[in-house]
Amino acid sequence: MAFQECVIEIAQEQAEAWSDALFDLGALSVSVEDADADTPDEQPLFGEPGLEPTRLAWNRSRVVALFDEETDPALVVTAAANALKVDPVPPYALRGVEDQDWVRLTQSQFEPIRIGEKIWVVPSWHDAPDPDAVILELDPGLAFGTGSHPTTRLCMQWLEANVRAGETVLDYGCGSGILAIVAKKLGAGDTVGIDIDPNAVDASRYNAERNRVEASFALPESVSEATYDLVVANILSNPLKLMAAMLSARVRPGGRLILSGVLERQAEEVAAAYAPWIPMSVWRSEEGWVCLHGTRPAAPADRS
């Protein structure tokens, strides 16, 4: 059985209504994407730590509806526009989707990934290429972080090169938990992961258990205001700038901060946001993304 995808670009405030209308009119699935994804205009959706996102769609949103081959998408789009009192009917594009063994296709897109010198991220349906390496068994799922994105790889490379045995670690915006898990496998001590998304917290706990790693994962409001030897945050530049004071305060004096999710052109402004507390510099770049690192100045010696 073949399928059809109908793609409509709409304004932010219409995204949820169009999604509901298309689904009610027979779409098999509906997703909303950033129409500016992978461009300089790409927008993150985020809220302050512990709060819900303030926006549910992007300024330019793309609604993608899937239909079976017997449905006429033109009639559905027209009916949805009428139901929403939208005139004229917005332009849309159609593209065919051939039926396939979707499980096998998905699995074929995720091969083991080597990161740094000795780290391998291995999906559960593959054997580890090097059993003596640092192996992370991780499948694509609900939360960001499988090692395929340059920002994740950069953070993992930094950890491999710099983590010290027994250091305490905070992974802020932990996603899948991959950075917390690799830190533990590289010898870190007590490790905590924080995310504002409950699904990410659940995914991190599951992945830690699968990898036989002891680490704690929780929502921000459930974690004490402790300081750590290492704080790593792989998010995006705007939330990193907003959280500069908070993240800097979670680094103990003499501890280190690692930031990624930052484009090369954004590195200077992110570093400037942290300058009052921690001097940050670019450690390494990859495919236009950077990893920044810095050390919090040690507390002045007591001269009394």
UniProtKB/Swiss-Prot annotation:
Its EC number is 2.1.1.-. S-adenosyl-L-methionine binds at residues 152, 173, 195, 234. Transmembrane segments: none annotated. It comes from the Bacteria. It is an enzyme of class 2 (transferase). Keywords: Cytoplasm, Methyltransferase, S-adenosyl-L-methionine, Transferase. It is found in: Cytoplasm. It holds the Pfam family PrmA. GO terms for biological process: methylation. GO terms for molecular function: protein-lysine N-methyltransferase activity. HAMAP family: Methyltr_PrmA. Belongs to the methyltransferase superfamily. PrmA family. This is Ribosomal protein L11 methyltransferase. The gene is prmA.
